[in-house]
């Protein structure tokens, strides 16, 4: 610890989904100028950086995670000048900028993919093309969004791989020019003043090259934490991340502790830190997302203990409850009624008391809930619509499917940020691209700032505490009640200091006396 502590090891990062944050033009879509307009609010909260989900040119099949040009701002979000103004305004306030890099796949509208449709083009090798057997795809891998992961391309007579939507073609990282082009993208944004990168599903980029069918699952074991993934990340880090001083956080799908100990090792050879999602599957009945089940809090505590202890003094965790793909945490593990405020504070305290870099997703700091949509037409998310169509065709009732979506859809976190109780919550002067939550007149920023006992000020205090209490950055982790079904009590210790966090996940009073 003789070296200065990197800013992100005692900092807090705020995730912004720009489309739903603040509209500055009245067209119903949030934009970069809207983010700039709200920087004073973020400065008051006390965050060290903002992470922007993709604002690049995109057909918006998957809300910007289908990138058609990595180095251009989509006109829906504004201009490059708007982006440059945002960076400058944020930096003046001591707020850093983290950009989202979607490097597993591009949009099929990307110039690389358009060129790759010609078998003789040098860009053909930028993507994963394979022959099938007659009408049968190359293997039985499933797309994360439903259906087969291979799409037949009639003009060139081969299938291309898409682990996500059909319009999101997987890049071929085995081909060195692909990696060189992606390094150029990182350099471009570093030149624009970006301070960090969030790498979308980055542990899926190395595929087993014989592409075997999976007799036991959906194929993920053949491309998750794949054979060359550490080599690829070390190359990116050596050539771009380290020379440019970029903080990097990898989104790791279905990963393991052992891999993350290497991805985010303190030596810094690959990434600064990693996201994993195991803790957000404790309400998946039988491991299946599209179900309704009560969370298993004993399992939740076990997962955090495993990662807190396994990464301690070896590697770095990214801590989060919410993001643009997850339902609101106060609806999921807390309470939407009379106990919403204490539940939101409790969940914040538990997470911010751990070792790692906490991430706050927009609206989490005011205790936003799921929106309670009542019709499939209220939803915009491609994954949600695909699930509804697929399951309805299998005979599940629309009411049952809507109940599942109300608890698990990605759109639960994508409703507009409510700034006040007036029209459209102050998000837009026009019709918002997606509906607001039904309780925005009660739960909004103006109301939170006016109430000294609000969730906002609890988050503000936790952010301040992380900067002033080194124990939070460096202390160990001991679960004091690992088998208790509703009490989450843990102890952190460092250099003679002790911190005990005690939280009640139930709606009933519980008694506990620390030893």
What are these regions (language model features)?
Residues 1-514:
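Active-site and adjacent substrate-binding regions of carbohydrate-active enzymes
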């Amino acid at each position: 610890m003789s070296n200065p502590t990197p800013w992100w090891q005692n900092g807090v990062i705020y995730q912004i989904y720009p489309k739903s944050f603040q509209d500055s033009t009245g067209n119903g879509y949030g934009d970069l100028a809207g983010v700039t307009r709200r920087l004073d609010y973020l400065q008051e909260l006390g965050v060290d950086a903002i992470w922007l989900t993709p604002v690049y040119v995109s057909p918006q099949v998957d809300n910007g995670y289908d990138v058609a040009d990595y180095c251009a701002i989509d006109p829906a979000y504004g201009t490059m000048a708007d982006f440059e103004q945002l960076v400058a305004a944020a930096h003046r306030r001591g707020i850093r900028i983290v950009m989202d890099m979607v490097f597993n796949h591009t949009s099929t509208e990307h110039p690389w993919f358009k060129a790759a449709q010609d078998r003789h083009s040098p860009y053909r090798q930028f993507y994963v093309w394979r022959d099938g057997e007659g009408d049968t795809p190359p293997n039985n891998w499933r797309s994360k969004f439903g259906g087969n992961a291979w799409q037949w391309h009639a003009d060139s007579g081969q299938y291309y791989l898409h682990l996500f939507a059909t319009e999101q073609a997987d890049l071929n990282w085995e081909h060195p020019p692909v990696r060189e082009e992606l390094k150029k993208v990182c350099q471009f944004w570093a030149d624009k003043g970006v301070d960090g990168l969030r790498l979308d599903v980055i542990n899926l980029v190395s595929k087993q090259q014989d592409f075997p069918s999976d007799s036991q699952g959906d194929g993920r074991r053949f491309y998750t934490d794949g054979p060359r993934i550490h080599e690829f990340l070390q190359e990116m880090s050596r050539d771009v991340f380290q020379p440019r001083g970029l903080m990097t956080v990898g989104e790791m799908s279905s990963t393991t502790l052992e891999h993350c100990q290497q991805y985010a090792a303190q030596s810094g050879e690959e990434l600064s830190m990693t996201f994993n999602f195991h803790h957000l599957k404790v309400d998946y009945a039988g491991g299946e997302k599209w179900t309704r089940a009560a969370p298993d809090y004993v399992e939740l505590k076990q997962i955090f203990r495993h990662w807190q202890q396994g990464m301690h003094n070896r590697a770095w965790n990214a801590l989060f409850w919410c993001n643009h793909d997850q339902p609101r945490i106060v609806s999921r593990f807390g309470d939407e009624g009379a106990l919403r405020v204490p539940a939101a504070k409790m969940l914040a305290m538990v997470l911010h008391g751990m070792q790692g870099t906490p991430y706050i997703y927009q609206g989490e700091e005011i205790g936003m809930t799921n929106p309670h949509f009542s019709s499939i037409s209220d939803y915009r998310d491609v994954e949600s619509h695909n699930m509804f169509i697929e399951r309805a065709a299998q005979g599940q009732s629309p009411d049952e499917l809507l109940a599942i979506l109300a608890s698990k859809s990605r759109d639960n976190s994508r409703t507009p940020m409510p700034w006040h109780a007036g029209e459209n919550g102050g998000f837009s002067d026009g019709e918002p691209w997606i509906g607001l939550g039904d309780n925005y007149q009660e739960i909004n920023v103006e109301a939170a700032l006016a109430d000294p006992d609000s969730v906002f000020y609890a988050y503000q205090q936790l952010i301040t505490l992380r900067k002033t209490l080194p124990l939070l950055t460096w202390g160990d982790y001991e679960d004091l009640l690992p088998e208790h079904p509703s009490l989450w009590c843990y102890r952190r210790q460092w250099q003679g200091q002790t911190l005990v966090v005690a939280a009640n996940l139930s709606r009933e009073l519980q008694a506990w006396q620390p030893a």
